Swiss-Prot record:
Domain of life: Bacteria
The species this protein was found in: Herpetosiphon aurantiacus (strain ATCC 23779 / DSM 785 / 114-95)
Binding site for substrate: 52, 139, 151
Alphabetical list of Gene3D superfamilies matching this protein: Acetylglutamate kinase-like, PUA domain
UniProt-annotated location(s): Cytoplasm
Limits of the PUA domain: 278-356
Name of the protein in question: Glutamate 5-kinase
């Protein structure tokens, strides 16, 4: 596997990995995986964890009551288990002096642009200050999200959210096989997939674990999402010795899915998808130079005028003094807010608005230059 010197990695742990073949959370397996993630951080990599297991943790905490099929029962177990799961993770990562932060998401949070910006800013700030984010779906309030494969899909969306180079989905299955290895002894592991297509989906079948909600089919769906967004994805067995460290070191473990586009191309398409027409931010010559020649973010000081209306999180054009559109980007502030802070210093934003979403009106990572 090609390696960057330092990577941003999303690790997804399924319920089957957390239980390690038992009917409860398996602490030795969890502490070993925590050790590996801590080791990756020590090597300079950034790690985000997407974890299943809240429902199981709740079931364990309540003394393993008889399982019921009602959605509300699952949600109640998730509500009980989420705090317990985070408490366990907090204790395990404390062994390696790794601070953790809990984030509960649904895919709806990542479809709405304002909530997307908020989630992205929170997670990137956590990474910046050395905190390991632990993400789970908000099962206690979600309705149609508690279904097969949701955390697989969520992990791919999170990888895109934080611009991860690598997504690793750990399971009780070692990867994608030519046939179901539990029923066909001649099945062989496929170590590399160039593109997710109908043949790959056919190989996935409906294989899955009874303890979790995800099967191989949903992992292939996640692979399609991740690779289209420019992220390499690997499916591997969670009980494989030192699996995370070996993967990041470049060893071939499990099944690798190659990205079919660059992360930059994918993000540009996403940013441009909802550009607000007949609206723009006019900037001065100094801002033009900072944006086009120095790769800077757009700050209030360089803004001279606001045209049109938009909401926070929408894509707006940036126009030079000669009227030429030089870039587009996700705006951290609504049009009426930009109108109030234009020409101001970043340190004055909070005193002008009474709050602040950050120093940048449009961050360079959320900008497409022309």
């Amino acid at each position: 596997m090609d390696r960057d010197l330092h990577m941003r990695i999303v690790v997804k742990l399924g319920t089957s990995v957390l239980t390690d073949g038992t009917d409860r959370l398996h602490r030795p397996r969890m502490v070993d995986l925590a050790r590996q993630m801590a080791q990756l951080r020590e090597a300079g990599h950034e790690v985000v964890l997407v974890s299943s297991g809240a429902v199981l943790a709740g079931w364990e905490r309540l003394g393993f009551p008889k399982r019921r099929r009602e959605l509300t029962h699952k949600q109640a177990l998730a509500a009980v288990g989420q705090g317990r799961l985070m408490h366990i993770y907090g204790q395990l990562f404390e062994i390696y002096d790794v601070p953790v932060a809990q984030t509960l998401l649904t895919r709806a949070d990542l479809r709405d642009r304002v909530r997307y910006l908020n989630a992205r800013a929170t997670l990137l700030t956590c990474l910046e200050i050395g905190v390991l984010p632990i993400i789970n779906e908000n099962d206690a309030v979600a309705v149609d999200e508690i279904r097969v494969g949701d955390n697989d899909t969520l992990s791919a969306l999170v990888a895109n959210l934080v611009d991860a180079q690598l997504l690793v989905i750990l399971s009780d299955i070692a990867g994608l096989y030519s046939a179901d290895p539990r029923h066909n002894p001649e099945a062989t592991l496929i170590d590399d997939v160039a593109a997710v297509n109908e043949q790959v989906y056919a190989l996935a079948g409906a294989a899955g674990s009874h303890r979790g909600t995800g099967g191989m089919f949903t992992k292939i769906q996640a692979a399609e999402l991740a690779t289209r967004a420019g992220t390499t994805m690997v499916i591997a067995a969670g009980n494989e010795p030192n699996v995370l460290v070996r993967l990041v070191a470049g060893e071939s473990v499990g099944t690798r899915f190659r990205p079919v586009s660059t992360r930059l191309e994918s993000r540009k398409r996403w940013i441009m998808a909802e550009r607000v027409r007949q609206a723009h931010i006019a900037v001065d010559a100094g801002a033009v130079q900072a944006l086009t020649q120095q790769g800077r973010s757009l700050l209030p000081a360089g803004i001279v005028a606001v045209e049109g209306e938009w909401r926070r999180g929408q894509t707006v054009a940036i126009v030079a003094p000669d009227g030429q559109t030089i870039a587009c980007g996700l705006c951290q502030y609504a049009a009426h807010e930009v109108a109030q802070i234009k020409g101001s210093r970043t340190s004055d934003i909070e005193s002008i608005l009474g709050y602040s979403y950050g120093a940048e009106v449009i961050h360079r990572d959320d900008m497409v230059a022309f």
